[in-house]
C-alpha cells in the first residue's frame, strides 16, 4: 500500500506533492485565523451600532463585509486548488498500488476476491484518504494555531467550573472532546464495528465470486446463490443494528456539543465582562479547537471503513508474499533437481 513512497519512480509526486498539500493546508488555516479576527471586529461594530444610532457609518459597514468577502474568496480559491491537486496526488498513489498488483497478478488471481481488492479496495482507499488524510492534517494545524488564540482570549474571563483560571477554556474543550471520543471509541470496540465491516465485505466478495462462476458454470444452482445471499443479508442486518446503537451515542453527543462553549462561558456572559465581538471570537476559536480534538469522533465511521479496507489489502498482500515465497522455494527445488540430475549423469 505504501510503495508509492518507496518507489523512486514516484518520489517526485510522493514527496513534492505531499509538501504542496501541507503548505496549502497551512495557508488555509492562516486565512481561517484572519476570519476569526474579523468576526471579533465585526460583532463589536454591530454591538456599537445597536447601542447608539449612527455610531458607525454605512461605508464602514460595507467595508467590513467586503473584507470578509475577500478573505472568504481567498479561502475558497485555496480549498478548491488543494482539493484538485489532492485528487491527482491520490490517484498517483492508487496507480503505484495497482501497478504492483498487476505485476504479480498471475499469482494474485488465485486469491479469493483478488479482482475486488485490486479494483474496488484501491479506489476506496484513495477516496477515503482524500477526505480523511487532509482533514486530519488540517485538524492538527488548527490546534497549533487556535489554541494560543483561545489561551489569549481566556485571560481574565470567569469560566464555568474553572473560575478565572487562564487555561480553563482549553482544558474544558480538551476534557469534553477526549471524554466524548473515548466514549465512542469504546462503544465502537464493544460493538466490534471494524470486524462487522470486514465480515460484510468478505461475504459480499464470496457472493460476487459465485455470481461470476454461475455465468459460465451451469452446475451452480440458484439454491447455492440463495444460501450465499442469505449470509449477506444476515451480516447487513447485524451491521444495521450495531450502527444504530453507535449512532445514538454519536449523534446525541454532537447535539450536546452545540451548547458546550456557551456552558463554559456562562459566568462571563451573565457578568457582562465580554463584548459581543470577543464572545464570538471565543466561541468560534473554542469550536475550532474542540472540532479538531473531536476529529476521531466525527470521522469515526470513515475511520472504521478505512481500517476495514486496510485490513483486507494487508491480508491480500500477505497472501501474495506467501505465494511468492512458495514459488521461490519451488524454483529453488527445481534448480536443485536439475543440478542433481546433471551431477548423476557426469558420474
Q: What are these model-predicted stretches?
A:
Residues 32, 36-40, 83, 98-102, ...:
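Alpha-helical transmembrane segments of polytopic integral membrane proteins
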Residues 93-111, 186-231, 290-297, 306-318:
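Short cytosolic helices in intracellular loops of multi-pass membrane proteins
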Residues 32, 40, 44, 48, ...:
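Membrane-water interface at transmembrane helix exits
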Residues 17-26, 133-195, 264-267, 271-274:
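Transmembrane helices of ABC transporter permease
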Residues 1-32, 41-68, 82, 86, ...:
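Membrane-integrated ABC transporters
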Residues 8-31, 51-92, 162-187, 276-290:
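Transmembrane-helix motif of ABC transporter permease domains
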Amino acid at each position: 500500500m505504501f510503495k508509492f513512497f518507496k518507489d523512486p519512480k514516484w518520489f517526485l509526486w510522493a514527496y513534492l506533492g505531499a509538501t504542496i498539500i501541507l503548505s496549502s493546508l497551512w495557508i488555509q488555516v492562516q486565512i481561517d485565523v484572519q476570519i476569526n479576527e474579523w468576526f471579533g471586529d465585526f460583532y463589536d461594530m454591530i454591538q456599537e451600532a445597536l447601542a447608539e444610532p449612527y455610531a458607525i457609518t454605512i461605508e464602514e459597514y460595507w467595508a467590513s463585509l467586503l473584507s470578509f468577502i475577500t478573505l472568504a474568496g481567498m479561502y475558497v480559491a485555496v480549498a478548491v486548488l488543494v482539493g484538485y491537486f489532492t485528487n491527482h496526488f491520490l490517484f498517483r498513489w492508487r496507480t503505484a498500488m495497482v501497478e504492483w498488483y498487476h505485476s504479480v497478478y498471475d499469482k494474485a488471481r488465485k486469491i479469493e476476491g483478488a479482482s475486488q481488492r485490486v479494483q474496488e479496495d484501491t479506489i476506496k482507499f484513495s477516496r477515503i484518504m482524500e477526505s480523511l488524510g487532509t482533514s486530519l492534517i488540517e485538524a492538527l494545524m488548527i490546534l497549533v494555531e487556535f489554541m494560543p488564540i483561545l489561551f489569549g482570549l481566556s485571560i481574565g474571563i470567569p469560566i464555568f467550573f474553572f473560575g478565572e483560571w487562564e487555561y480553563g477554556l482549553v482544558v474544558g474543550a480538551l476534557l469534553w472532546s477526549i471524554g466524548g471520543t473515548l466514549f465512542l471509541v469504546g462503544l465502537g470496540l464493544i460493538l466490534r464495528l471494524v470486524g462487522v465491516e470486514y465480515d460484510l465485505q468478505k461475504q459480499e466478495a464470496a457472493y460476487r465470486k459465485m455470481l461470476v462462476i454461475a455465468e459460465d458454470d451451469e452446475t451452480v444452482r440458484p439454491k447455492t446463490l440463495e444460501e450465499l445471499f442469505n449470509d449477506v443479508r444476515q451480516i447487513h442486518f447485524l451491521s444495521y443494528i450495531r450502527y444504530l446503537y453507535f449512532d445514538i451515542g454519536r449523534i446525541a453527543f454532537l447535539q450536546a456539543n452545540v451548547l458546550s462553549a456557551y456552558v463554559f462561558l456562562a459566568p462571563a456572559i451573565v457578568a457582562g465582562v465580554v463584548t459581543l465581538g470577543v464572545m464570538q471570537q471565543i466561541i468560534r476559536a473554542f469550536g475550532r479547537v474542540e472540532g479538531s480534538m473531536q476529529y476521531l469522533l466525527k470521522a469515526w465511521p470513515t475511520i472504521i471503513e478505512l481500517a476495514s479496507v486496510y485490513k483486507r489489502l494487508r491480508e491480500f498482500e500477505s497472501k501474495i508474499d506467501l505465494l511468492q515465497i512458495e514459488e521461490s522455494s519451488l524454483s529453488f527445488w527445481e534448480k536443485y533437481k536439475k543440478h542433481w540430475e546433471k551431477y548423476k549423469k557426469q558420474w
